[in-house]
């Protein structure tokens, strides 16, 4: 127990240092962001955290704070709910190569929201860029849209392109991307012939990742 108390004391000391470095929003942007994280995650004081993220985003354009601000605005946590404002700050963070912000921005433009103009072309661009930047969730999200069979997807079906995206996602050890690639290569799809050797290869990788993560969120073996 003493060990936990010592860690907690050290953490509190570190946070006091960040508060000092932040200097009421006039100091270091990284320090201010850490104070916001502390208030949100540890203290559950979403009102204060939201104000800090808002100031750090609006005055410093600090991408991680803009991303957190966007999530708060989407959820109406600590700040009034606003899809339009969330889209704006996600766009700002994405422009500074914050890949999770690009993922959220792409999702919003795929499905739309209140107070902003849905832009499918922009959704595809930011998800593709985010995928290339190494965020496997973006690879998988865009690939799933390109594989929809119901005719209601926001983008036309394109299995070959989807395969490339899933391969990128799987190369980053993203279990869902590997799983979806396994299914595609077992069954084949338009422009993507079945490939038993590749299917076995990706199935083994999926199973290995699943074992490491104790399962991949309800996915079953292909």
Model-predicted regions and their roles:
Residues 1-30:
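N-terminal leader/linker segments that initiate helical-solenoid repeat arrays
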């Amino acid at each position: 127990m003493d060990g936990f108390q010592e860690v907690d004391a050290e953490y509190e000391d570190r946070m006091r240092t960040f508060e000092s470095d932040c200097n009421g929003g006039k100091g270091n942007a990284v320090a201010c962001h850490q104070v916001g994280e502390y208030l949100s995650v540890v203290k559950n004081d979403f009102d204060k955290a939201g104000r800090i993220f808002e100031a750090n985003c609006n005055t410093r354009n600090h991408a991680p704070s803009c991303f957190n601000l966007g999530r708060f605005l989407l959820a109406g946590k600590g700040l009034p709910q606003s899809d339009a404002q969330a889209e704006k700050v996600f766009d700002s963070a994405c422009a500074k190569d914050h890949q999770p912000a690009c993922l959220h921005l792409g999702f919003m433009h795929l499905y739309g929201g209140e107070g902003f103009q849905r832009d499918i072309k922009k959704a595809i661009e930011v998800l593709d860029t985010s995928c290339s930047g190494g965020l496997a969730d973006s690879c998988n999200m865009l690939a799933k849209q390109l594989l929809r069979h119901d005719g209601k997807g926001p983008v036309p079906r394109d299995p070959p392109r989807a395969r490339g995206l899933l391969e990128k996602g799987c190369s980053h050890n993203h279990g869902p991307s590997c799983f979806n690639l396994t299914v595609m290569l077992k069954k084949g799809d338009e422009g993507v012939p079945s490939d038993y050797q590749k299917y076995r290869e990706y199935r083994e990788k999926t199973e290995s990742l699943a074992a490491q993560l104790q399962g991949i969120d309800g996915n079953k073996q292909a």
